[in-house]
Amino acid sequence: MRIKQIIMTSLLSCIMAMTVIACSDDDGKKIPAPSPKEQWSATLKGDGEVLGAYPDLYCNYWEYTYRADENSDKILCLKGEFPHCRYFSVSLYNDETGDVFSGINDQDIPADKGSTNPFVKTTSGKNYFTIYVVPNGTPQSVIDKLGSEKVVKVAKGVNKVAIALRHYLGTTADGSQKDEYAGVELPAITALDMDLHETSVPEHVASNIAKVTSKVFTQKSDENKEMPFFLAPVSMYYPNSFTAYLYGRTHLREDSVLTFSFIPAPVPTKPEEYKDAVTRYWSICIGSASDTRSYMSIYDKKARYADGKKATFVICLKKNPKLAAIQSKVNEMNANGEYVNLFIWDSEKKNIDGNPIGEVVAVMYRNILPDKDWEHSIARMTPTAYKDDKGEPIDHVTDPDEQLAHKALGDYGPLGVKVSNDDFLK
């Protein structure tokens, strides 16, 4: 019996030694590391009403930013457990400009040996991944040793790198409730030298991500009756490069409501459908043009809609004198089998700066991982620049059939229209 215990103890010791993470030093030196939550920023919450540039309310973000120019001989290793969420990605940004230059989304992250990627195949239990961030100019021989499919590269000329994690709709492991960290610990960050020996992790320096905001400006077209939707260009505001956005903007009035109807993209119901889905997720998000923060949103599974059917979205000021009647009308329409979603915008709500969020709103229709080959995909449209010194978005339209969503996508493209209270209630 004693011999059996000794054998089992030795076997367990071997297994533990073999399962030490690949990012550890192979010459026996151990470098103390803080816990992952100490390595990453505090949670940047999409629904925290703090972040600018119209974030999605259903997404949490974390950043780790470091000086790439001062650590050009270091490889970063991110090792963690796949989170329990609808969508997960790692993006790399030039923190001096906000431009995205690399990244990897959940379904393309290889699972560690013995694990399964839960964004590819339905699975249970804990599943792990490893991602390496290598400096520009890293020899291919080093990349080959790491496994090229696990490597993301720092672009030439980028001096300061912001690594951002995104979790959409994170839950506990059993999916029963919302969870800030999607039921897992954040990935641990370690560092290797070019000989793949463990070395010190670069200092986490202050990032510009938390400070980002889109430009605040006025537009004459905000007063127009129609609010067209445009495809957003890839911007300098730390965008998710795996996401496409339609945007529109208008001034809400007390004597009318803003409405738009279209057929939303169908979404997959299980991981096995993710790869061939026309989009992973969609949401409608409403933000204030006065501070570029998001305040209201609804995502696919919470919206009133059905695949292949038109859904209607109505935005009404809280101070609209006919609000009660408008609410009753929407309830009646839904009772009659329509798919109508009502947003009540409180223009007098104070933001964190103590200012009212106002009556001018930006409306975003967001698609994650849109399939450009799908004939109704918003990603097929031609992007339209935001307001600049040459004019407003509507002034940048040179090809309406490719730039205006309702023309480019037909029933799958929204067009906002201000409808008088009386006409809406007829």
Regions found by a protein language model. Give the residues of each.
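Bacterial signal peptide processing site
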Residues: 24-27
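A compositional/structural signature for long, glycine/proline-rich flexible linkers
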Residues: 30-426
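C-terminal motif of bacterial Sec signal peptides marking the signal peptidase cleavage site
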Residues: 18-22
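Bacterial N-terminal signal peptides that target proteins for export
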Residues: 1-11
